[in-house]
Structures are given as C-alpha cells and as structure tokens.
C-alpha cells in the first residue's frame, strides 16, 4: 500500500471515531434532557423512566464503542 492510501485510512478512522463520539454526546444529552423533563412532569413514573433511560443510554453508547473498535482495526490491522 502506498503512503497516500495509508494516510487516507488514518484520516478516515480518525473522522469515524470523532463523529461517533460527537453523535453519542449529543444523543445522551438529548436523552438526559428528555428524562429530566419527563421526571419533572410525572414524578410517579421516575422508576420506570429511569430503567428505560439506562437501557436506551446503553444502546446509544454501544454504537461509538463499536465504531472505535472498527476504527482501531482500520488503524492497526488494515493500515499496517
């Protein structure tokens, strides 16, 4: 592989991991805001909302973890 292709792989992996982190941060911020909004409107449903919040937060966090794994694979397995 020539150096231009390797440099493009480094840039692609970096952009992929960065955008995944930014997307997760925005998603968790929106999710937390909606949780607080729902808890303020109906305090009786806080246990139900909390369990749903943590399930969805785990799903939102799983996507960047997978993306970081793929990015590291590109950096260390494909580009070397």
From Swiss-Prot:
The chain crosses the membrane at residues 11-31, 54-74. Its main location: membrane. One of its GO terms (cellular component) is proton-transporting two-sector ATPase complex, proton-transporting domain. Keywords: ATP synthesis, Cell membrane, CF(0), Hydrogen ion transport, Ion transport, Lipid-binding, Membrane, Transmembrane, Transmembrane helix, Transport. It is a multi-pass membrane protein. It is found in: Cell membrane. GO terms for molecular function: lipid binding; proton-transporting ATP synthase activity, rotational mechanism. The record marks 61 as: Reversibly protonated during proton transport. F-type ATPases have 2 components, F(1) - the catalytic core - and F(0) - the membrane proton channel. F(1) has five subunits: alpha(3), beta(3), gamma(1), delta(1), epsilon(1). F(0) has three main subunits: a(1), b(2) and c(10-14). The alpha and beta chains form an alternating ring which encloses part of the gamma chain. F(1) is attached to F(0) by a central stalk formed by the gamma and epsilon chains, while a peripheral stalk is formed by the delta and b chains. F(1)F(0) ATP synthase produces ATP from ADP in the presence of a proton or sodium gradient. F-type ATPases consist of two structural domains, F(1) containing the extramembraneous catalytic core and F(0) containing the membrane proton channel, linked together by a central stalk and a peripheral stalk. During catalysis, ATP synthesis in the catalytic domain of F(1) is coupled via a rotary mechanism of the central stalk subunits to proton translocation. Belongs to the ATPase C chain family. This is ATP synthase subunit c.
